[in-house]
Amino acid sequence: MTTLNLSIFPSVKISSSASIPGFIKIQPFLLRRKLSTVLSVTARDEGIIHNHFDFTSYMIGKANAVNEALDSAVSLREPIKIHEAIRYSLLARGKRVRPVLCIAACELVGGEESVALPAACAVEMIHTMSLIHDDLPCMDNDDLRRGKPTNHKVFGEDVAVLAGDALISFAFEHLATSTAVSPARVVRAIGELAKAIGSKGLVAGQVVDLTSGGMDQNDVGLEVLEFIHVHKTAVLLEAATVLGAIVGGGSDEEVEKLRRFARCIGLLFQVVDDILDVTKSSEELGKTAGKDLIADKLTYPKLMGLEKSKDFADKLLSDAHEQLHGFDSSRVKPLLALANYIAKRQN
C-alpha cells in the first residue's frame, strides 16, 4: 500500500472564525453572460451586498486594466518565439480572478488600483506559468486551456517549459521594479509570493497531486485532498489577496483577516472546480471536462459525493463572508461579490 507522508510540509488549515493574440479588451457581453448567476446571488446575499453594486462592470473594468498592464509588461520582442509563447497564454481570455482579488483587497484597505496593478500582474504571470506547466504531458497532459490549444500543443514542450520559467522571472522583476510603495512593503510582498509558489506552496501541492493519482481512496483521505488543494490552488489566491493588502498599506490585523478569507475562497475555488469537472462539458468549461475522473485523480465528489461537496462549498462561502465582517461596508462589496462568483461560477 502506498502512503503519503505530509509531515514534511507545514499544516495549513481552513479557519472557520499559434496565432498570437493581440491585446483585446473584454467586452461587456462576454462577462455578462458568465456573471448573470452571480449578480442574482449578490442581490440577495443576506443584505450584505446591496443590489446597486454592479459587479459585472467592476469585473470588466478591473480585468481590462489588468490586461492592458500585462500587454505592456510583456511586449513582443526578441527572441520572438519565446515571447510569442508567453503572450499566447498570458493574454488569453481568462476571468482574471486572482489579479482582481489583489486590486479589491488593496482598495479595501485604502489603496489605489494603480498601486496594486504590478502585484496583480505578477500574480497572473505566476498563475499562467502554473497553467502552462500543469498542462504538460509530464503533468496533466491536457490539450485545451481557456478554450484554446494548450501552450505546448502550439509551441512544443521545450518552448512551453521555458515560457513558464520566464514568467516566474517576469513576475518577480515586475513586482520588484514597478510597485510604487515603500521598499519594506515590496520586500514583504516578494516574500509572500515566493513562499506561495515554492516547495512549501504550489510545488508541494502539485507533487502530492501527482503521487496520489490512481491510489485507492481508502488509502487517501480528505486530509490529503485538502493539502493538495490548499497548496496547489488556494495558496495563489491567498497570495493575490495578501499582496493587495500589503501594498495597499493594510494593518497586520487586516492582512491576516484577508488571508483567512482568501484561504476559504481558495479552497472553495477548487471544490467548485471539482464539481464542474463532472457536471459540465468541455465546451462549457473551455478546458477538457472529466479529465480528473479519467486520470483517476482525487476530487471532492470522488471522496465525498456530489451533494456533500456542494454542502462543503456552501460552508466555505459562509466562512469567507465571516472574515470580512468589520470592514467598510461599501469597499468590501467587491470581495463579497467575488466570493459569490467563485461559488456560483459555471466554468
Curated annotation (Swiss-Prot):
It is found in: Plastid, Chloroplast. Pathway: Isoprenoid biosynthesis; farnesyl diphosphate biosynthesis; farnesyl diphosphate from geranyl diphosphate and isopentenyl diphosphate: step 1/1; Isoprenoid biosynthesis; geranyl diphosphate biosynthesis; geranyl diphosphate from dimethylallyl diphosphate and isopentenyl diphosphate: step 1/1; Isoprenoid biosynthesis; geranylgeranyl diphosphate biosynthesis; geranylgeranyl diphosphate from farnesyl diphosphate and isopentenyl diphosphate: step 1/1. Isopentenyl diphosphate binds at K95, R98, H127, R146. PROSITE patterns: POLYPRENYL_SYNTHASE_1, POLYPRENYL_SYNTHASE_2. Its EC number is 2.5.1.-, 2.5.1.1, 2.5.1.29, 2.5.1.10. GO terms for cellular component: chloroplast. Mg(2+) 2 binds at D134, D140. Keywords: Carotenoid biosynthesis, Chloroplast, Isoprene biosynthesis, Magnesium, Metal-binding, Plastid, Transferase, Transit peptide. It catalyses: isopentenyl diphosphate + dimethylallyl diphosphate = (2E)-geranyl diphosphate + diphosphate; isopentenyl diphosphate + (2E)-geranyl diphosphate = (2E,6E)-farnesyl diphosphate + diphosphate; isopentenyl diphosphate + (2E,6E)-farnesyl diphosphate = (2E,6E,10E)-geranylgeranyl diphosphate + diphosphate. Binds 2 Mg(2+) ions per subunit. GO terms for biological process: carotenoid biosynthetic process; farnesyl diphosphate biosynthetic process; geranyl diphosphate biosynthetic process; geranylgeranyl diphosphate biosynthetic process. This is Geranylgeranyl pyrophosphate synthase 7, chloroplastic. It comes from Arabidopsis thaliana.
